[in-house]
């Protein structure tokens, strides 16, 4: 406002064009959160005349962001925490048209926790994903590389990966038909990545037990499953892209664990 009224000019409310949740700069991903970093709390609404979002190529998952923008325009949130709660409710409304949880909306939201980050450089707003899982991944890897006992951490990660796989399988089988038609590539990628991680965790256990045969079998199985996870391609305007889930923390953890097993 100060810039636009310099020299005594009259202020006219502006319309905002927000480059979110567009994935033109990170084509292999979906962005299913992060609105709190663009639609800021406690903004003077009299300064704005409108908000326009730049959506993803995929219209159905773009509805998560559209729900947040509609809520923001109707009743502006007061904190980032409130904005995140709105984003959580969006999965319910987009899935069933209701604000309450359903089995499939909960599964979709669980997957959405790992489809937020743009995986880009400092030119764009950094969006954090896998917020709850990331510290667990880091703790396991740190202890594993230090040669410490990771049995408890391994069991916890097995449960986390099994939960994500189950969510992807459930949504693939029973989720909203129009949504599934646009995101099944990421569901398949998630299932294969979780299976690959399970195999690599088996390999980490084999290292502790000095079981070279099981180590090799687990490593090879995980390697093939990861390679398979990279085969789910979709048309992006005029070329094919590979769908990827968990680009910020899950995939780097998988690749790091693969290297640990490979060196053994």
Residue ranges and their predicted role:
Residues 1-264:
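Substrate-binding groove of N-acetylhexosamine-processing glycoside hydrolases
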